[in-house]
Amino acid sequence: IKQLLGAGGQGEVYSVESGHKAYALKWYYKNTATRNQKEILDNLIQSGPPDASFLWPQDMIFRDYGESFGYIMPLRPQNYRSIVDMMKRKAEPSFYCLCKAAYHLTKGYHALHGKGYSYRDISFGNVFFDPDTGDVLICDNDNVSYNGAKTGIYGTPRFMAPEIVTGKAKPSRNTDLFSLAVLLFY
């Protein structure tokens, strides 16, 4: 383990090195390291990423049976910036690169939906882009599950479809499209 990269409600993310190769490790807090979460991750690892824009789980990491667990994924290159960086003018892509980023983002989610999955939590915090090329990387893919599956992930306020907020629907490919539209036109 090299350093802590960040922490959230489910766990902490570290940069790690194995065999002279860098990865990111998400380690779940004990209360979020559930059997359901492990089953979701096992499925995602087995199915593989929808396309190259996803920082997809690659392998599970365990301490001891019954203990907390985590997974490794590719480490985001430093030249990729968050959408919040762009809004704060810490990254200033050209209009052409913004259009390419929007294209790559929609193409990535289309590939995800084509595999029968929904993302469930599209928001500023889960997308990074290269301001020089418009390439995108989608992270936090442990939210992903089969379309219509019951999980505890409903989305991020301001990005959630109205039917989720009112309790009339669960997250799905269709509600992902609403969240994606909010993200693209924010």
Kindly give the residue locations of the regions a language model identified:
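ATP-binding glycine-rich phosphate-binding loop
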Residues: 1-20
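The N-lobe alphaC helix and its flanking beta3-alphaC-beta4 segment of protein kinase-like domains
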Residues: 29-50
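Conserved structural core of kinase catalytic domains
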Residues: 55-101
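Catalytic-loop of the protein kinase fold
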Residues: 109, 113-131
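Activation of the activation-loop gatekeeper triad in protein kinase-fold domains
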Residues: 139-145
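Conserved activation segment of eukaryotic-like protein kinases, specifically the C-terminal portion
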Residues: 150-167
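Conserved catalytic-loop aspartate of Hanks-type protein kinases
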Residues: 176
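Short, conserved alpha-helix in the C-lobe of eukaryotic-like protein kinase catalytic domains
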Residues: 180-186
